[in-house]
Design a protein with these regions (language model features):
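Rhodanese-like catalytic fold shared by cysteine-dependent sulfurtransferases
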Residues: 63-104, 110-115, 122-155, 159-220
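Glycine-rich phosphate/pyrophosphate-binding beta-alpha loops
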Residues: 10-16, 38-46, 73-75
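A short, polar/charged loop-to-alpha-helix boundary motif
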Residues: 43-62
């Protein structure tokens, strides 16, 4: 088996309208030589694969990905392109800064000798988590190290991998054996058993309105929230903060750029 890293960057700068997420996967060997890559998304997929394929053809390494100078403007990319970012993530593994595992490898660990640790916020954990996980938000981790057993392997994860990496560094510096799940819960969630779909159709008669008619109404119990351009856990936390401030029967409309936000 070869080292694998998953990443979920935006196709271009998140503060620029229309930023949509990519999902990227990179395979490489212990010397850093690139063995393959995959990417899916709505925008900017082809150029990332073209770049990595070119580096692969020239027998390049993950270190080469980190040094590439690629076209940059907010509508097209970020100052650090997703290709650079997946190179950084792979380089961290090769440098020994972090040890990773994939969701597919999770069943291979002895759960009696390990702790599955979710380092996301309490709101994110309540919204969905891996079975058997213990929730300690990364911001509270230093104060709650006493809740963890140093004799057990810590299997940390967050939403996409960044906070899991930070948690793994904190834990390693305090003498814990720890691995971070690359790609985080976002990668794992698509492999979890599917939730049953809502029934189709409406069983009762209802009045219909056009969008123009709805917008024309002055609804005192109506709030609009723009969660576009926020990185995790920003959108979910912003929704929770708004909901905590709302009264019963108020309606909340949420606008988000991430197609998977509804999950």
């Amino acid at each position: 088996s070869y080292p694998t890293v998953y990443l979920h960057p935006n196709a271009h700068a998140s503060y620029y309208p229309g930023a949509l997420p990519l999902t990227m996967k990179l395979l490489f060997d212990d010397s850093g030589r690139i063995l393959g890559a995959q990417a899916i998304g709505i925008d900017g997929v082809d150029k990332r694969i073209d770049v990595i394929a070119t580096v692969l053809r020239l027998k390049g390494t993950v270190a080469d990905l980190t040094e590439l100078e690629l076209a940059y403007a907010p509508p097209y990319s970020s100052a650090k392109d997703p290709v650079n970012m997946i190179g950084f993530a792979a380089e961290n593994i090769l440098a020994g800064l972090t040890d990773v595992f994939t969701y597919e490898q999770l069943p291979s660990f002895d759960r009696s000798q390990s702790i599955l640790l979710d380092v996301r916020t309490e709101a994110e954990f309540a919204n969905g988590h891996l079975p058997g996980a213990l929730n300690i938000p990364v911001d509270d981790l230093r104060q709650r190290l006493g809740e963890l057993n140093k004799d057990k392997l810590i299997l940390a994860y967050c939403q996409v991998g960044l906070r899991g990496y930070i948690a793994s560094r904190i834990l390693a510096q305090h003498g814990f054996r720890v691995k971070n799940m690359t790609g985080g819960y976002k990668t794992a969630s698509v492999q979890l058993p599917n939730k049953p779909a809502a029934p189709c159709g409406i069983e009762i008669d209802t009045e219909t309105q056009t969008v123009r008619e709805v917008k024309a109404e002055q609804k005192k119990n109506y709030r609009s929230l723009n969660a576009c351009g926020l990185s995790c856990p920003g959108p979910l936390m912003k929704v929770k903060t708004t909901l905590d401030d709302m009264d019963e029967e108020e309606i909340l409309e949420i606008t988000a750029a991430d197609p998977g936000f509804s999950d």
